[in-house]
């Protein structure tokens, strides 16, 4: 909205031409989301505290988590609210990718909200039944894939690329493209949700990955940079840096309240939405495999659950003391802050490795 106003005012004052620069608007988007989060956060937390009982705690979980009982949840609504407002203010609302990512974020956020509401209303830590959750996620994931495939305006937008191997480019059929899009959106949505089990554990890797994806989006949308870096040129993808910056700002604002010991939990409303956004942006800028590297913490958490469940069903034995794997380290005696910070460190390293692929091609 403000971007459109600035474009109109540019005819009267050249200073407003600053708003044509994505880098300038991305900084404004990040700061707007950050300050909105810090401003709205205390009020929202007070409102969420009115839900009696707060976040239900798993009875089979680590005993130290029982002290978290009563902590308000659904704090992810703060992130979705501030990201949406920031993007509407500073984003180019004529860009279809901007609208797609916003719709995906709000759609998966709605699924998460319903899941959280069931947990609170029924005092059931399991929430919405898995089959219904996956059905709803699948509908939106497939819809996003179909939209991206049939609105693609360049061959690069529907081609699969292997990082560091510029000569490998695999054209995708409609079925394979939609399948990959579905898997990345739904997969990362649930991966971030599985990671969100400790105070601040999921949000910092999300912020880091969002910042890195913003770099890829900016480069992909710029013909000069994408040609130099030998990454696919996707017209219009550059505007996604606004969303990535808004997520970074909102995420840091949320972390202010979610840092150990947390005043509020993200809930599925935030985790499912943010994971879906990361997956969607990675698909748009054709960096699916790079996301697997940069989001390695989310991938490891998910694999630990898959390994645990598979092992127990086949052999009756558990590989980990508890899954997801962050609980395994808790039960080994690691204090919660140590687990969190070490996972953050791993995430920083993996994001740097992902960014390094920009030059290693």
Curated annotation (Swiss-Prot):
Protein name listed in UniProt: Phospho-N-acetylmuramoyl-pentapeptide-transferase
Cofactors: Mg(2+)
Transmembrane feature ranges: 26-46, 73-93, 98-118, 139-159, 168-188, 200-220, 237-257, 264-284, 289-309, 339-359
Compartment(s): Cell inner membrane
Organism of origin: Xylella fastidiosa (strain 9a5c)
GO cellular component assignments: plasma membrane
Catalytic activity, as annotated: UDP-N-acetyl-alpha-D-muramoyl-L-alanyl-gamma-D-glutamyl-meso-2,6-diaminopimeloyl-D-alanyl-D-alanine + di-trans,octa-cis-undecaprenyl phosphate = di-trans,octa-cis-undecaprenyl diphospho-N-acetyl-alpha-D-muramoyl-L-alanyl-D-glutamyl-meso-2,6-diaminopimeloyl-D-alanyl-D-alanine + UMP
Family, as annotated: Belongs to the glycosyltransferase 4 family. MraY subfamily.
EC number(s) reported in the record: 2.7.8.13
HAMAP family: MraY
Protein function: Catalyzes the initial step of the lipid cycle reactions in the biosynthesis of the cell wall peptidoglycan: transfers peptidoglycan precursor phospho-MurNAc-pentapeptide from UDP-MurNAc-pentapeptide onto the lipid carrier undecaprenyl phosphate, yielding undecaprenyl-pyrophosphoryl-MurNAc-pentapeptide, known as lipid I.
Pathway: Cell wall biogenesis; peptidoglycan biosynthesis
Keywords for this protein: Cell cycle, Cell division, Cell inner membrane, Cell membrane, Cell shape, Cell wall biogenesis/degradation, Magnesium, Membrane, Metal-binding, Peptidoglycan synthesis, Transferase, Transmembrane, Transmembrane helix
Membrane topology: Multi-pass membrane protein
Top EC category: transferase
């Amino acid at each position: 909205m403000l971007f459109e106003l600035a474009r109109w005012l540019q005819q009267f004052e050249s200073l407003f031409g600053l708003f044509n620069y994505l880098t300038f608007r991305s900084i404004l988007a990040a700061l707007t989301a950050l300050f909105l989060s810090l401003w709205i956060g205390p009020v929202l937390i007070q409102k969420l505290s009115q839900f009696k009982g707060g976040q239900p705690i798993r009875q089979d979980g680590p005993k130290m988590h029982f002290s978290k009982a009563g902590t308000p949840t659904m704090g992810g609504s703060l992130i979705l609210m501030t990201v949406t407002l920031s993007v509407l203010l500073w984003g180019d609302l004529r860009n279809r990718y901007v609208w797609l990512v916003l719709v995906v974020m709000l759609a998966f956020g709605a699924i998460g909200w319903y899941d959280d509401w069931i947990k609170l209303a029924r005092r059931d830590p399991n929430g919405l039944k898995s089959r219904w959750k996956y059905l709803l996620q699948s509908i939106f994931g497939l819809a996003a894939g179909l939209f991206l495939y049939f609105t693609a305006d360049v061959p690069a937008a529907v081609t699969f690329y292997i990082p560091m191997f510029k000569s490998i480019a695999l054209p995708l059929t409609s079925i394979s493209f939609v399948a990959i899009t579905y898997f990345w959106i739904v997969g990362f949505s649930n991966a971030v949700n599985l990671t969100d089990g400790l105070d601040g554990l999921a949000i910092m890797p999300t912020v880091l990955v969002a910042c890195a994806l913003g770099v890829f989006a900016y480069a992909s949308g710029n013909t000069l940079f994408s040609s130099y870096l030998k990454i696919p040129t996707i017209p219009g993808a550059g505007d996604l840096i606004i969303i990535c910056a808004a997520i970074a700002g909102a995420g840091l604002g949320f972390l202010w309240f979610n840092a150990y010991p947390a005043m509020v939990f993200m809930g599925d409303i935030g985790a499912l939405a943010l994971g879906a956004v990361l997956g969607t942006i990675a698909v748009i800028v054709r960096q699916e495999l790079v996301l697997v590297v940069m989001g390695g913490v989310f991938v490891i958490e998910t694999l630990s659950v898959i390994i645990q469940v598979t092992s127990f069903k086949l052999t009756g034995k558990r590989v980990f003391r508890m899954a997801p794997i962050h609980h395994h380290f808790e039960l080994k005696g690691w204090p919660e802050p140590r687990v969190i910070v070490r996972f953050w460190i791993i995430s920083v390293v993996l994001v740097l490795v992902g960014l390094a692929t920009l030059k290693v091609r």
